[in-house]
């Protein structure tokens, strides 16, 4: 189950998306969360298998969903996606741009909404690996590679694996892919370039040395602008979206 499926059933959601794609979800949150809770109860009562996708904004939000399953005799396992903050934010922009490209009316997560869920995950994992109701936690990379599996009472730190992957330096290939996608999004989302630049600044400290910003450690003489040959205006930013992960 995923919250977006319940949002889409709300009679006001499409209108709210057209008016404000960044806050439409928050406007109907109470309704779709209530429906989601009812669906969870329906599944538990019928002993159905269930996989829930979500981005909890707090420890309490996770446990409000997970603990009723444990109390009903379900083994509860978490799969945690460990992604750098810049990559995570860029992915939200990519989903938004792709949806616009095919004529949909998509949502676009706000800075503050992303920040809340991204940083809450640290607390969520720390609490979950200590809680007896959580049978196991598996931390995976963006490409699906498992980094660590922590089982209740066992060794291993899911919190450490999450933090380490989030702080992992980019390889040359990853850095090149990040900037290729950035350039495509820059052309596709001109109204959001301030946020796209924020994503670059988040990524910079983890970039290979050749892609780090220049240090300003001594005064330099004034320099005039150099002639730069621009790429053709016919450049198609959508080509990035069709290839990007």
Describe the predicted segments one by one.
Residues 8-9, 85-91, 146-149:
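Switch/connector loops and helix/strand junctions flanking conserved nucleotide-binding motifs
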Residues 55-57, 81-84, 142:
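An acidic- and aromatic-residue-enriched active-site/binding cleft used to recognize and process polar
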Residues 98-102, 111-146:
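Metal-dependent DNA phosphodiester-chemistry modules and their immediately adjacent helices/loops
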Residues 72-77, 133-136:
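Short glycine-/polar-rich loops that comprise or flank the Walker A/P-loop
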Residues 1, 77-79, 138-140:
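Hydrophobic/aromatic beta-strand patches that form the interior of the parallel beta-sheet core
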Residues 1-66, 70, 104-108:
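Conserved nucleotide-sensing/catalytic segment adjacent to the nucleotide-binding pocket
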Residues 19-21, 74-120:
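A glycine- and Lys/Arg-enriched "phosphate-lid" helix/loop adjacent to the NTP-binding pocket
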Residues 129-245:
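C-terminal accessory extensions appended to soluble enzyme cores
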């Amino acid at each position: 189950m995923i919250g977006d499926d319940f949002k889409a059933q709300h009679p006001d959601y499409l209108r709210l998306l057209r008016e404000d794609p960044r806050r439409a979800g928050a406007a109907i949150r109470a309704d779709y969360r209530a429906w989601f809770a009812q669906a969870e109860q329906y599944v538990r009562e019928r002993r159905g298998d269930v996989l829930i996708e979500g981005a909890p904004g707090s420890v309490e939000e996770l446990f409000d969903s997970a603990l009723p399953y444990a109390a009903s005799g379900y083994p509860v396992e978490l799969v945690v996606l460990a992604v750098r903050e810049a990559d995570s934010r860029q992915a939200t922009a990519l989903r938004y741009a792709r949806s616009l490209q095919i004529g949909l009316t998509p949502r676009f997560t706000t800075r503050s909404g992303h920040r809340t869920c991204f940083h809450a995950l640290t607390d969520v994992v720390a609490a979950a690996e200590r809680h007896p109701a959580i049978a196991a936690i598996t931390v995976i990379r963006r490409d699906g590679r498992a980094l660590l599996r922590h089982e209740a009472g066992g060794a291993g730190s899911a919190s450490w694996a999450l933090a380490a992957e989030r702080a992992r330096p980019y390889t040359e290939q990853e850095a090149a892919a990040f900037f290729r996608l950035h350039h495509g999004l820059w052309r596709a989302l001109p109204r959001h370039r301030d946020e796209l630049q924020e994503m670059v600044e988040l990524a910079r400290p983890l970039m290979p040395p050749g892609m780090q910003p220049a240090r300003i450690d001594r005064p330099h003489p004034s320099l005039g602008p150099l002639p730069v040959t621009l790429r053709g205006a016919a450049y198609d930013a959508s080509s990035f979206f069709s290839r990007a992960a």
